[in-house]
């Protein structure tokens, strides 16, 4: 239903408002319109609204069902809803208090992404930013002019009031940092919300159950992740930083709020029925998968999904390796990961190492093997924990001669600041797993040199300009960032900054992930392996004596009266 070029029309304010509402109306399916009408009628017809039937702010907020812990977010979103409901006049005309049916239509179209069916070109981020922070003037009653003095050529972007809005300088408008963190936290909590399966309260109950935690801990975990995202911006957030956050750092984080407003399309009877359904268990791929873990819970999954949606479905993940369970050794790592024939994601967390590690002899050895980057910025964020990840698009393998991976691989940082380092097209040093000396695994570096044949001295290793390295004992790690020219692009936040993050590893995990075809193949393989393992563990107790006699005859085990033979 895109807009076509047409001869300009002269319309009144009332006609313009009705025209936009009609275009919004056409973006919804009949069943969705039925749900919206049902919610509107059920709300306003059971209250004393007088002659003017409009939904109040309190009734609107109640339909959304935002938890009381997020009152600041509720205030932001209801303020935004009022601003968007006044489109296309926004802040150029006062609006009437409350919400009409057409107002709800407009709000849903903007937040759900359906605006792409109405606009040829559109910049939603400026409109969202301003709508969250700027209040419309409210009048007891608003009458739109019926004089046809507005020119409209079919393109809303060139319509006078809209054009005026986008030309307005909003550089003085700032998103208070604490409120921005609250907003991000709620988006992370809301990740995975499906309005067809019940209310926000049901969603939170489900997440708490699946994470084996409590509401307070869930909110705290999500707030910690939100702070990591917010550190990509400095101070209070202006429009430039808001764009950076939602264009580059977390481009998919706003999706949950669209689903929140889609709640208005589901009848209260449907929501009540779904809320009474039992919480569905979360089933990661493979019966031996573990969830949640030290590194993977709802907050982490939501944070990864904010920049890479296909990492956000736990049911498409399989535990391949967990350092705390399987042991911090390359052999254990290899045993867990090398059989997986689809993409995977590695997560590693650790504690930052100081420049002077006299108390950690092995840390000094690591420093000698991987020299520090001169001129690197000393972190001043006050955080001690770091968390990195790496997405590998091919199976793991040993790499004594050549590296593996492709430009689809990428390094990412989750803490203390969210950052992404995408794979470059031409370079080839995307990943290596090295068993012989000096050993270890790295992403973005060439295969290292071995110890000198005659001197027995370990030469300092060369790492890629943007690279992540773990030593052979999976005890220490290093993230190196020295600009362009490597297998991975520089930071999206600080591309020109020299960084050398060194850390003592606390946890390492690898999770298998893939598309539907990969996963179906892997499901069959896993089921076969589990059946075989179960079969091998099964002993036919009725044939123990017969089996033992056969093994004695074959010389595999010794009989009670049997003497040893001679060479």
Curated annotation (Swiss-Prot):
Transport as UniProt keyword: no
Superkingdom field: Eukaryota
InterPro entries tied to this protein: TLDc_dom (IPR006571)
Main localization category: cytoplasm
Entry similarity comment: Belongs to the RTC5 family.
Keyword Signal: no
Protein name stated in the entry: Restriction of telomere capping protein 5
